[in-house]
């Protein structure tokens, strides 16, 4: 019984010691925040079935909802079962700058369960730079000595020794241990190993993690880190020499099939081509109490899966501008930052939940000198527009009658039916509605008149045939060009003038005293290549085309538009065709007989009058 109590006590004591190596626990939440050059970032790890929500507090304690807002410079990434990230710029809303030059932001954190109930809530004050850690751009943005292009720069998670490579970029990996501050060795003028001396670790403030910033480029790995049993991943390095491989932070063994490969550590490579490569080994993951399958990039909003995954390694090779990588411009340097984190696998039992996974978070940083990038003179040629898709479809057309030849005003619906004298001009316009493509052109095919509102009513009289004035009319229809100066889309209009006429009954040749309606069939044309959308009415081809068909054979495949109303005629006289000779010989004789009868009547009247005059005399 005594041994059992001893074992239980030992486990309870040992567990906090192990967890203390990775994070500081505080009742409520496990969280951490970082101070950057232009802003601060809060990272909160939720418990199972929790979703983290953020609010900010002003100086009076009022709470305000936090959303992705470019005006307040707030950004939030919060998903169930994943770490929640809240980023705020130093010039963002409710960020206060104190007299000591530090920025303060009060954040209210609450964990919400799936049923909507708030499980835990806590206030956190973010202070940047941190009181016990002064962050300056010069502390990690020191430019390299002799820039050389096209060399990837790497850094390992556990640098035992290292030296600075010549190149235009820096890399940094930040491990999250409790306030372990490395003391850099004095700079050396000659290339060689530079080993950071690490003082004895001491615990910091509960509820936050302090950063151990390890700035080095091209870390040489110890031989024990290069003992990779299987599943070697070739290192991305230019050249195949041992020196180039080691400068890239990789292992070299000329006895192997791939002599340059990644070691048992975390390797970061930053490339001037716009990519970074992050490689983590299974041995490193197990050392930190995490599973390699649970490692991912923290800032990726929709997930950014590894480009390669084996039983021994996981590889991320992604563009610098993707996967949630943050970019900052500090002076003449570009800083790209992201984090490699691991999810906690929780096992739920009938009476509680446990986990055997540690908490792992690694801050990665790529730094480039912007002045080292060469300018590019580019000429941008706009691609050819795609060929138009031609197919049948509805068109909105309108036929209207103008009040005069200027086509500046038009009759309204209440003005119909119009009354016109024979041979008086009628000004007709057809236009395309609800189209703004200047390349479209309205094409008239057939225009005709009928005595009713039906376009198929008989009799009919053609006005335009195949887009040209009907040649069988002695009063030829006159086409009127659209005014390009006043019309925004002049090709959407067609205008013509006709002389007023009345339709005759086909059998009696009597004038129809009803009204006349006008119709036109039309389509929209879009020129392709050397083709045009104009109609030529003076060529032999056009005359042949016009005489080869009739409007009744084409109107069913086209859109038909009609006039808003009819044109009527008052007291239309009975007309005879000019070529008719019916009863032409008898009509003069009838007139002579009528004149003779009238003369006889008048003569009789005169004789009677004279007789009465003589009698009185």
Curated annotation (Swiss-Prot):
Residues 610-617 are cytoplasmic. It holds the Pfam family Zona_pellucida. GO terms for biological process: binding of sperm to zona pellucida; prevention of polyspermy. It comes from the Eukaryota. PROSITE patterns: P_TREFOIL_1, P_TREFOIL_2, ZP_1, ZP_2. Residues 224-264 form the P-type domain. One of its GO terms (cellular component) is plasma membrane. Residues 181-196 have a biased composition (Pro residues). One of its GO terms (molecular function) is acrosin binding. The keyword Amino-acid biosynthesis does not apply. Residues 269-540 form the ZP domain. Expressed in oocytes. Glycans are attached at residues 49, 68, 369. Proteolytically cleaved before the transmembrane segment to yield the secreted ectodomain incorporated in the zona pellucida. O-glycosylated. Residues 179-198 are annotated as: Disordered. Residues 1-20 form the signal peptide. SUPFAM superfamilies: Trefoil. Belongs to the ZP domain family. ZPB subfamily. Component of the zona pellucida, an extracellular matrix surrounding oocytes which mediates sperm binding, induction of the acrosome reaction and prevents post-fertilization polyspermy. The zona pellucida is composed of 3 to 4 glycoproteins, ZP1, ZP2, ZP3, and ZP4. ZP1 ensures the structural integrity of the zona pellucida. The ZP domain is involved in the polymerization of the ZP proteins to form the zona pellucida. Polymers of ZP2 and ZP3 organized into long filaments cross-linked by ZP1 homodimers. Interacts with ZP3. This is Zona pellucida sperm-binding protein 1. It comes from Rattus norvegicus (Rat). The lineage of its organism: Eukaryota, Metazoa, Chordata, Craniata, Vertebrata.
